[in-house]
C-alpha cells in the first residue's frame, strides 16, 4: 500500500511590524494560537490523532528556544504524548518541517502530523544572541 501525504489545511498568523500591535506576544504563544486554530477548523482530525509536530525556526534561542515545538504542543492543547522537534534550516526551516512530516506520512511512520514555523524577527538580533563564527570560516569570502 502506498501512503500519500495530503495537506488538509494551511493557516498563518498576521504579519507584524516593528513596534506594532503584536509587540509583547511571545512566539510560542503566537504559534500555539495558529496550531489551536488549525485544529478547531478541522474537526475531522482530533488532537489524539496527531502523531508529530515539526516546528521550523531559524533562531531557536531566547523566547523561541528551549524546544519551542514542545511548548506549542502544550499551549495549543494537544496531548502531551505528541512528540515535537525543531528544524533549523534558516529561511527554509518551515518548508523543511513540511518535508519531514510528509516524508514520515509517506513512509508509513505516522498518519497525521503538523508542520509549522515560527520566527520573531524582533526578539532575536541578526546572528542570534551570541554569534561565535569559526575564525577560518569567517575569513572566507
Regions found by a protein language model. Give the residues of each.
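Short polar catalytic/cofactor-binding loops
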Residues: 11-15
Amino acid at each position: 500500500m502506498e501512503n500519500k501525504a495530503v495537506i488538509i489545511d494551511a493557516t498563518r498568523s498576521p504579519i507584524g511590524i516593528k513596534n506594532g500591535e503584536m509587540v509583547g506576544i511571545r512566539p510560542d504563544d503566537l504559534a500555539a494560537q495558529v496550531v489551536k486554530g488549525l485544529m478547531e477548523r478541522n474537526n475531522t482530525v482530533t488532537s489524539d490523532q496527531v502523531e508529530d509536530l515539526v516546528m521550523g525556526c531559524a533562531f531557536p534561542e531566547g523566547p523561541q528556544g528551549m524546544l519551542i515545538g514542545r511548548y506549542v504542543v502544550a499551549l495549543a492543547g494537544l496531548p502531551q504524548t505528541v512528540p515535537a522537534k525543531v528544524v533549523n534550516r534558516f529561511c527554509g526551516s518551515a518548508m523543511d518541517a513540511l518535508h519531514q512530516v510528509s516524508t514520515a506520512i509517506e513512509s508509513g511512520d505516522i498518519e497525521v502530523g503538523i508542520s509549522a514555523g515560527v520566527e520573531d524577527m524582533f526578539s532575536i538580533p541578526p546572528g542570534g544572541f551570541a554569534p561565535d563564527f569559526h575564525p577560518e570560516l569567517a575569513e572566507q569570502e
